[in-house]
Amino acid sequence: MPRVTVTLGLALLWSGSIHAQSLQAGAWSSNGSAAGYVMEANGRATDPDGATVSLQSQNAAAGTFGSAGSSLVADAIKGRRVSVSAELQTRGVGTGASLWLRIDRNATMLMMDNGVDRPVRGDSEWTRYSVSLPVPDDATMIVFGVLLRGTGRVVARNIRVEAGSPLTPGGPLADPAREVLEAAIAIVKQNALRRDEVPWTTVEPRVRAYAAGAQTSADVYPAIRYLLSELGDHHSFLSPPSQTTALRTGSVRNLDPEVRSMSDGVGYVMVPGYQGWEPSALRVYAGQFHQLLDTVRASVECGWIIDLRQDVGGNMWPMLAGLKPFLGDAALGTFESLSKSSPPWRAGAGVGVQPSSSLAVLESAWVAVLTGPRTASSGEAVTIAFRGRPRTRSFGLPTAGLSTSNGTFALPDGAALLLTTAVEADRTGRRYGDKIEPDQLVENDPAKGDPAIEAATQWLRASSTCRAGAK
């Protein structure tokens, strides 16, 4: 079982950042991972002509997203399937645009489909798009909208919400659907970190009821997502076959790390998230990371800033391999499951790229680590890797709170469960599993530039005294 600390699970949470309780029924609200998106909305999805919504990025990075959302009370649609449909027009969309749909019970998400596994990209003319989910009898709200990831513009017109036929209680499942559902339930029961906290006598019958009548494996995905939501770890998720294939083949688009020397003699390293498991791509990433460090190293006299504030997660191993010059061969942490501790994990494990000897000096360099609310999952694993390192201090804001580890479990149809199976512990044995507080809290204040970088720079210059050892 590959162990990958991932945050593709954030794809399930993105649109969940719009809270149904904050919306007036039928009204539209915008949200996202960062500033830089503009929303325009007209009409309601229940109007005869539907609604029209546009989202446009303005100076948005490839790893960010903008979301528009609306909601309806679920009372009139309980016990039926609900569909949200629209026509999408895109311009210059690099990462993807889609519709999303979420079913809530009070303040808890029951199930969701955000369409990230079937994005509309590039320039397209009025592509028909729809998402559909069953509405359980205990649902209270239906939340839905438009999602734009990365750069570009999307217009969704004729957005409509429609109730379908009643769900068939106890309807038989076709073999492909049954095989996937049974495999998912068994995997969760045997491996989930919080499996003992699930009221199985209540939850399992609901899962099977939500999957009733399913004919294809995709038809049971909403039921599986509901099951994962009942774990309450906020990190487990289902990766459909197309998304799983993209991760395994290295076809996911990733941002490059940024390495540069600042004017005050401090080195700056920005580590973004990294999605993918393909071995040769991991080696290329780590090797290029080392080359960037080697190019800048000689001009750095006062220590280094490792900026993890945009590290939304993915695969922790190439990130640690790229940062191995700072981390060396030390034991950095462990994965703590219900029954055992993993062997200590180390930088470079599973990637197979060693930094050049010219970078050995960085192992004793002064390092300031920056964190924030978008530092998530594998970004938090990297944060933990620096805990207990000499000459190191962290600055900024608390992390996202996903400092747990996911194992990858294949399903019969090519999909995969990325299931939370352990919490993470640092080299001193301290266990996490929630938000990680920085050593020095620094609030964001755009009017004052970047206070976290300023605080980190002041500490580096005072601590390292800009000696040769700071390199």
Indicate where each model-derived feature is located.
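Extracellular and organelle-lumenal recognition/adhesion modules and their flexible linkers in secreted
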Residues: Q21-P172
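Loop/turn elements at helix/coil->beta-strand transitions in domains of secreted/extracellular proteins
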Residues: D264-V266, S299-W304, D329-L332, E363-V367, ...
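Extended, small/polar residue-biased N-terminal targeting/export presequences
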Residues: R195-D264, T465-A470
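Bacterial N-terminal signal peptides
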Residues: T5-S17
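Gly/Ser/Thr-rich loop/hinge elements
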Residues: G313-L370, T404-A410, T421-R427, R431-Y432
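Short acidic catalytic loops
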Residues: V269, L292-G313, V369-L370
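STAS-typified acidic loop motif
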Residues: S261-A286
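Terminal peptide-recognition signature
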Residues: A184, L227, V269, I306, ...
